[in-house]
């Protein structure tokens, strides 16, 4: 029973969910209420059998936004619901998961309406000549609430009563999608509590200059833009020492002090950037937030820092086995601001975080830094996959700057980028003995000519524009653990410089680049580099002068001129759009007026996003000075989140974008095109009734087919209506697409090493999708790894999982009773039941060859549970580790049990 609301509080809307506190989840209820004319958000928590209420007033400082799709840690057994962030006056940001997406959106709409209503009630305070602060009428601000909801799907344009793509929750990560469109007002990006209090000091007089303009947010942004252009007038370059280290620890715990690595220079560094790979190799590390190894290595690092200075941890970010720590001298911490972290998994389906990258970006004084720690694909022959991993990390990793209304920043939009990690590039020399002989002769330069990273950089296929210091140390991989002996196992790995540190940017001078042979914990040796980096330090006196001058110039221009834009084109056609295939169209906008201007794409009336979920503009907002031009890219990418409604005809490649010019007019851009339907994202019922490839089926029949299939699934009918009018043959037992993929893997991949653990190649995945959409091939193109990933993508994109949502809880309840488990499966609709049994038979067959393919029952059960047995939307946020374990156990019963009759 929920505790009563405060006296006089009138509830307007309520949602239930979980508050996220690091790895913990606590049940809670969020209630929008009105009391004494004031709107409030009431948070009710259940802590240790006690009820706790927090009340946050809804005023001009209140923020409530929904997150777009993110990857904190890869948890493929979980299917998180909507995530929202709440922040108010003097209150830290709080994060919540709401399981019911539809209710969440309605609740956020109610909060938005309350914010607007409350803003109209605000009465400006009596102005005081001694005070610079003046309350602003919120309604005069430039679309403060437009695009407030930062989610990917534009649900306001959908009929929620229809069968929609209910599986489209942020668990699956496509490898190369454009990021979702973020609202201008999106707040902090994941668990960061960065303070901006150490920015260049702004006096009350300077603040006062901002206020007279009614659109103060726009004005402040324009002045910041002008200040950035005149930066050289008020900054000095000051040199700081950066220590950068990387170590693949092979899942080991620290067994000795790290001083030989971290405290090897006479003078202490100002900043430490320390990256680990393979921190935790346990299966649990892939699916849970907690890791004992994280604590062990973090403490070991803190103990090993330079003894001549005191340090404070600035940030830690971890994705499974990759961890990055940033430490700064305590006297420098106050100059670090705008901290953000991001993670990208490039493992199978872009989910498994065994490979990928983690990064921290920050501003140190007035210079922007991005530190990336990555672990790229293994195996000598897979250098192209490593190149792809690098490109994927660059394409998918973007940061939302805390407390800043700025577009997302990618890695390359920073002034200094340091990239470290186990990049896994090997030597193109198959003879290990020859390599060891050259090492003994200290002929490293000859060996480096065969280094794959050097070759790929020369060919401009990876790490273009990055620099690397001269390598004078012997290869850091592979050794027998606890020794300095080269690998003596049966595989006898060829030594290689897998562990590297590269950088890009100006005023960067590398002093040392070395390995540390003293540490023998792992089969890799740690590597470090010491840098002198020139950092822009603000001279506050000169800054104030430039600031005030910029404001005066702005005042004169605003009084005399209005902004104006010129667009190179306004109509865009995207032809033959396909699932997971990115298309781009570019155009230019030019400031042909006399004053700096701010542009942004804004939502249309009654919309929460400026575009549909398959479209985005990059950049979606920015500043232009007179005669300045910027290129805008319009990107169309159909992911699992939008494929079903496009397949069914509920949506089309049609949209209108509104390009808004502050203090100016709006410009309208027309988007049109055609979409080619895909079997990916089509229901199992519909596919079982298609005897031909989906591209050969008329669109009108596809729509009818999906509608009929939905009704049939709801009624659990055993007999299916045939596709062709007048046809009498029964539907297929399983969709031909699943049969083709599974049959290929059964014939050719049972002995494939690391099956379902190594990602496919992007080009091959697209070939497989096209092949299944357009034909019934005798053989599937691409490698076994690509075919395996295609099968997983297919299962993930299903509108309804193989085990239907309504049977999810029964599956958990019967997880440890094989007899009841089989009874539950027997209640599935016919095609779902057939697909489940077919997949289980195939996976049992794979397990017979585990000696060759490195597949084990726990790994397979964990991976496929997230695809076959997904929790329904109303249970997503409530899913506990126990629920996940029961779901895995349910599948294990079929994988390890005897074959069904």
UniProtKB/Swiss-Prot annotation:
Keywords: Cataract, Cell projection, Ciliopathy, Cilium, Cilium biogenesis/degradation, Coated pit, Cytoplasmic vesicle, Disease variant, Endosome, Golgi apparatus, Hydrolase, Lipid metabolism, Lysosome, Membrane. Its main location: membrane. It is an enzyme of class 3 (hydrolase). Changing residue 768 to N: In OCRL; uncertain significance; abolishes PHETA1-, PHETA2- and APPL1-binding. The keyword NAD does not apply. One of its GO terms (biological process) is in utero embryonic development. The record marks 757 as: Arginine finger. Residues 1-119 form the PH domain. Residues 721-901 form the Rho-GAP domain. Coiled coil: none annotated. It catalyses: a 1,2-diacyl-sn-glycero-3-phospho-(1D-myo-inositol-4,5-bisphosphate) + H2O = a 1,2-diacyl-sn-glycero-3-phospho-(1D-myo-inositol 4-phosphate) + phosphate; a 1,2-diacyl-sn-glycero-3-phospho-(1D-myo-inositol-3,4,5-trisphosphate) + H2O = a 1,2-diacyl-sn-glycero-3-phospho-(1D-myo-inositol-3,4-bisphosphate) + phosphate; 1D-myo-inositol 1,3,4,5-tetrakisphosphate + H2O = 1D-myo-inositol 1,3,4-trisphosphate + phosphate; 1D-myo-inositol 1,4,5-trisphosphate + H2O = 1D-myo-inositol 1,4-bisphosphate + phosphate. It is found in: Cytoplasmic vesicle, Phagosome membrane; Early endosome membrane; Membrane, Clathrin-coated pit; Cell projection, Cilium, Photoreceptor outer segment. Brain, skeletal muscle, heart, kidney, lung, placenta and fibroblasts. Expressed in the retina and the retinal pigment epithelium. Residues 164-186 are annotated as: Disordered. A motif (Clathrin box 1) lies at residues 73-77. The keyword Kinase does not apply. Residues 564-678 are annotated as: ASH. GO terms for cellular component: centriolar satellite; ciliary basal body; cilium; clathrin-coated pit; clathrin-coated vesicle; cytoplasm; cytosol; early endosome. Pfam families: Exo_endo_phos2 (PF22669), OCRL-like_ASH (PF21310), OCRL_clath_bd (PF16726), RhoGAP (PF00620). Catalyzes the hydrolysis of the 5-position phosphate of phosphatidylinositol 4,5-bisphosphate (PtdIns(4,5)P2) and phosphatidylinositol-3,4,5-bisphosphate (PtdIns(3,4,5)P3), with the greatest catalytic activity towards PtdIns(4,5)P2. Able also to hydrolyze the 5-phosphate of inositol 1,4,5-trisphosphate and of inositol 1,3,4,5-tetrakisphosphate. Regulates traffic in the endosomal pathway by regulating the specific pool of phosphatidylinositol 4,5-bisphosphate that is associated with endosomes. Involved in primary cilia assembly. Belongs to the inositol 1,4,5-trisphosphate 5-phosphatase type II family. PANTHER family: INOSITOL 5-PHOSPHATASE, INOSITOL POLYPHOSPHATE 5-PHOSPHATASE OCRL. It is linked to Lowe oculocerebrorenal syndrome: X-linked multisystem disorder affecting eyes, nervous system, and kidney. It is characterized by hydrophthalmia, cataract, intellectual disability, vitamin D-resistant rickets, aminoaciduria, and reduced ammonia production by the kidney. Ocular abnormalities include cataract, glaucoma, microphthalmos, and decreased visual acuity. Developmental delay, hypotonia, behavior abnormalities, and areflexia are also present. Renal tubular involvement is characterized by impaired reabsorption of bicarbonate, amino acids, and phosphate. Dent disease 2: An X-linked renal disease belonging to the 'Dent disease complex', a group of disorders characterized by proximal renal tubular defect, hypercalciuria, nephrocalcinosis, and renal insufficiency. The spectrum of phenotypic features is remarkably similar in the various disorders, except for differences in the severity of bone deformities and renal impairment. This is Inositol polyphosphate 5-phosphatase OCRL. It comes from Homo sapiens.
């Amino acid at each position: 029973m929920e505790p009563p609301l405060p006296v006089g509080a009138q509830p307007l809307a309520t949602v239930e969910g979980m508050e996220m506190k690091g790895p913990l989840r606590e049940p809670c209820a969020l209630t929008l209420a009105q009391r004494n004319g004031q709107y409030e958000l009431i948070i009710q928590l259940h802590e240790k059998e006690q009820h706790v209420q927090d009340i946050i007033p809804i005023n001009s400082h209140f923020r409530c936004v929904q997150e777009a799709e993110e990857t904190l840690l890869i948890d493929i057994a979980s299917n998180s619901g909507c995530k929202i962030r709440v922040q108010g006056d003097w209150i830290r940001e709080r994060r919540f998961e709401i399981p019911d997406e539809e209710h969440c959106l309605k609740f956020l709409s109610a909060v938005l309406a309350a914010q607007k209503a409350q803003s109209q009630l605000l009465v400006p305070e009596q102005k005081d000549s001694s005070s610079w602060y003046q309350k602003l009428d919120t309604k005069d601000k430039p679309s403060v609430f437009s695009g407030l909801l930062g989610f990917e799907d534009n649900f306001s344009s959908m009929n929620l009563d229809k069968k929609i793509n209910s599986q489209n929750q942020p668990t699956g990560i496509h490898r190369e999608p454009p990021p979702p469109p973020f609202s201008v007002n999106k707040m902090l990006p994941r668990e960061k509590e960065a303070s901006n209090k150490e920015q260049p000091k702004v006096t009350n007089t300077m603040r006062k200059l901002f206020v007279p303009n009614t659109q103060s947010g726009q004005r402040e942004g324009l002045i910041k833009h002008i200040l950035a252009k005149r930066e050289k007038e008020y900054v000095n370059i000051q040199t700081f020492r950066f220590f950068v280290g990387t170590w693949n620890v092979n899942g080991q715990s620290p067994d000795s002090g790290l001083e030989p690595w971290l405290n090897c220079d006479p003078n202490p560094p100002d900043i430490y950037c320390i990256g680990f790979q393979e921190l935790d190799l346990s299966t649990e590390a892939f699916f849970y937030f907690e890791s004992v190894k994280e604590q062990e290595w973090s403490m070991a690092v803190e103990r090993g820092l330079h003894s001549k200075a005191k340090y404070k941890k600035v940030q830690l970010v971890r994705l499974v086995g990759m961890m990055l720590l940033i430490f700064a001298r305590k006297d420098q911490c106050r100059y670090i601001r705008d901290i953000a972290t991001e993670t990208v998994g490039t493992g199978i389906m872009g989910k498994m975080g065994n490979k990928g990258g983690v990064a921290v970006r920050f501003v140190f004084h007035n210079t922007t830094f991005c530190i990336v720690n990555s672990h790229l694909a293994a195996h000598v022959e897979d250098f192209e996959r490593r190149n792809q991993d690098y490109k994927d990390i660059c394409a998918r990793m973007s940061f939302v700057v805390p407390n800043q209304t700025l577009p997302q920043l990618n890695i390359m939009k920073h002034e200094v980028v340091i990239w470290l990690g186990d990049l896994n590039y090997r030597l193109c020399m198959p003879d290990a003995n020859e390599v060891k002989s050259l090492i003994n002769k200290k002929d490293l330069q000859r060996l480096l000519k065969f280094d794959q990273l050097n070759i790929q950089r020369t060919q401009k296929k990876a790490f273009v524009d990055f620099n690397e210091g001269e390598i004078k140390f012997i290869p850091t991989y592979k050794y027998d653990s606890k020794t300095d002996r080269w690998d003596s196992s049966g595989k006898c790995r060829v030594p290689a410089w897998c562990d590297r540190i590269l950088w890009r940017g100006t005023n960067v001078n590398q002093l040392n680049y070395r390995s540390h042979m003293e540490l023998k914990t792992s089969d890799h040796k740690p590597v470090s580099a010491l840098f002198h980096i020139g950092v822009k330090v603000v001279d506050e006196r000169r800054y104030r002068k430039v600031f005030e001058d910029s404001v005066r110039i702005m005042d004169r221009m605003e009084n005399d001129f209005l902004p104006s834009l010129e667009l190179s084109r306004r109509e865009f056609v995207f032809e033959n759009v396909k699932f997971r295939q990115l298309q781009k169209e570019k155009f230019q906008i030019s400031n042909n007026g006399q004053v700096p201007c701010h542009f942004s794409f804004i939502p249309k009336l009654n919309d929460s996003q400026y575009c549909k979920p398959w479209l985005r503009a990059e950049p979606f907002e920015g500043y232009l000075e007179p005669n300045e031009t910027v290129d805008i890219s319009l990107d169309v990418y159909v992911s699992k989140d939008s494929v079903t409604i496009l397949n069914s005809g509920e949506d089309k490649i049609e949209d209108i974008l509104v390009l808004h010019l502050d203090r100016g007019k709006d410009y309208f851009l027309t988007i049109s095109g055609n979409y080619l339907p895909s079997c990916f994202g089509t229901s199992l019922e519909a596919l079982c009734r298609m005897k031909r490839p989906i591209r050969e089926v008329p669109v009108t029949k596809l729509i009818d087919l999906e509608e009929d299939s939905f009704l049939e699934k709801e009624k659990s009918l055993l007999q299916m209506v045939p596709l062709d009018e007048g046809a009498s043959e029964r539907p297929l037992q399983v969709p031909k697409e699943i049969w083709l993929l599974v049959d290929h893997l059964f014939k050719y991949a049972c002995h494939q090493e690391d099956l379902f653990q190594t990602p496919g190649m992007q080009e091959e995945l697209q070939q497989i999708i096209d092949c299944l959409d357009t034909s019934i091939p005798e053989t599937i193109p691409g490698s076994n790894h690509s075919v395996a990933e295609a099968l997983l993508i297919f299962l993930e994109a299903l509108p309804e999982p193989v085990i239907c949502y309504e049977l999810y809880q029964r599956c958990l309840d019967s997880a440890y009773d094989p007899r009841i488990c089989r009874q539950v499966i027997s209640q599935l609709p016919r095609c779902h039941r057939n697909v489940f049994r077919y997949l289980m038979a195939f996976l049992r067959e794979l397990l017979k060859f585990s000696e060759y393919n490195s597949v084990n029952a726990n790994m397979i059960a964990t991976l496929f549970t997230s695809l076959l047995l997904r929790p329904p939307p109303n249970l997503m946020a409530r899913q506990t580790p126990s629920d996940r374990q029961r779901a895995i156990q349910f599948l294990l019963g079929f994988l390890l049990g005897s074959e069904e009759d």
